[in-house]
Amino acid sequence: MAAAAVAADQKVVTMTSLREGCACAAPPAAAAPPMPKMAAAQRVVAELREACATPAARLAEVAAAMAGEMEAGLAVEGGSSEMKMIVSYVDSLPTGGEEGSYYALDLGGTNFRVLRVRLAGGGVAERVAREVPIPPGLMSGGGATSECLFGFIASALAEFVGEEEEEGGLDGGERELGFTFSFPVHQTSIASGTLIRWTKAFAVDDAIGEDVVAALQAAMSERGLDMRVSALINDTVGTLAAGSYYDEDVVAAVILGTGTNAAYVEDATAIAKLHPSQLPASNTMVINTEWGSFASPCLPLTEFDEALDQESLNPGEQTYEKLISGMYLGEIVRRVLLKISSRCPSLLGGAGELATPFVLRTPDVSAMHHDETPDLSIVGEKLERTLGIRGTSPEARRMVVEVCDIVATRAARLAAAGIVGILKKIGRVDGGEGRRRRSVVAVDGGLFEHYGKFRRCMESAVRELLGEAAAERVVVKLASDGSGLGAALVAAAHSQRA
């Protein structure tokens, strides 16, 4: 996401300026007189709870702002919206009736996955997968070229296909492949997209500006592999496809894991930036929102969020993601505990490893948040093993759990506001379609799947914002492996029309 800017003078919009611009933001606290150390620590927690507050009125404003940003992002390419609202060119989702064998390639890190999925017209009859490590020399360095990288991937695909029996497949004909490519691309059709830049450990310079589908297709052809890339997608679109395969009422998909994103089904005529010649016969189009970049003055930001943002690799960007995703929740908690330790050193037994950025991970936060032992022994164990803080008192452990609860609750309720914002945008909240049929949101990611209190809080907040009557028609459900199964299903959905 490009850093937010004011068009007149290109002034960067920081988290601080967002908070100051919000009508519902609390005024700066007056300087407090000196207080005993324990009271000072308790004051840190009280101020955190106040700053992270997400009453229904504020969440409603966030949902409305989300819907407004979505509208702006659909209006014009490269406009004022922080949300990119990328047209995926997926205009047909799986129905559950697809048959045959389809393949998927999931490339997004130092390993890639290849899968074969056999569909039996009503379910997945068989799924076979393999994970392949990529040699470091193919990802960066002097020998890292597009031809070598995609050649290696194509060779692994050919080997995988050669070892598989064609049970109910394509009778030796051309095979269909869904390609999940988790790097920024400029997509121009369902099966083409030019690489904008690499992220993570990749630095294959000659691939930038290249059509990654064409590069893979050429490598497969050179190796005699009769396979066609039917769809180029990201994991969020794949999650939508996977959810749609099992439930025809799925209208949106959300990733809540290390990162976060959302995709949804839009009325194609509502996409003003789409040329009339590009309107699909189905009149629907899946939109990749890139909602992690969403920013609004009424997002409840704290001093800890602002410091994290300024010290990040992308200050002023990905505001929403830094508040709700698994990558950052542990780090926010760490920063709060570090301040508590500075105010009351005896409470947490000294700082230990608290000064080390990102040493506390969200799974650690979840484990402490869910601790129901009488003496909060799990909290004590985590503090000792992860942070080197020994001999904590029950009072200190309760304070740590409270901090975890505040940070996770804010994240869950803001995620709920985003979901409601999408439902508002497509008319599934007030009247119309929302009154007549179910609206299902498929969610993937470890934060939602494994952090029970986060999940329950988010679901409760969705019901709170919608109201009981509307909430009866909205379902939030888990949908796994969008990057693998979802890619194969999109390939199946698009090959059926070929």
Curated annotation (Swiss-Prot):
UniProt-listed Gene3D superfamilies: 3.30.420.40, 3.40.367.20
Catalytic activity of the protein: a D-hexose + ATP = a D-hexose 6-phosphate + ADP + H(+); D-fructose + ATP = D-fructose 6-phosphate + ADP + H(+); D-glucose + ATP = D-glucose 6-phosphate + ADP + H(+)
Top-level taxon of origin: Eukaryota
Region (Hexokinase small subdomain): 95-233
Binding site for ADP: G109, T110, N111, T258, G446
UniProt keyword list: ATP-binding, Glycolysis, Kinase, Nucleotide-binding, Transferase
Protein name in UniProt: Hexokinase-1
Species this protein is from: Oryza sativa subsp. japonica
Organism lineage: Eukaryota, Viridiplantae, Streptophyta, Embryophyta, Tracheophyta
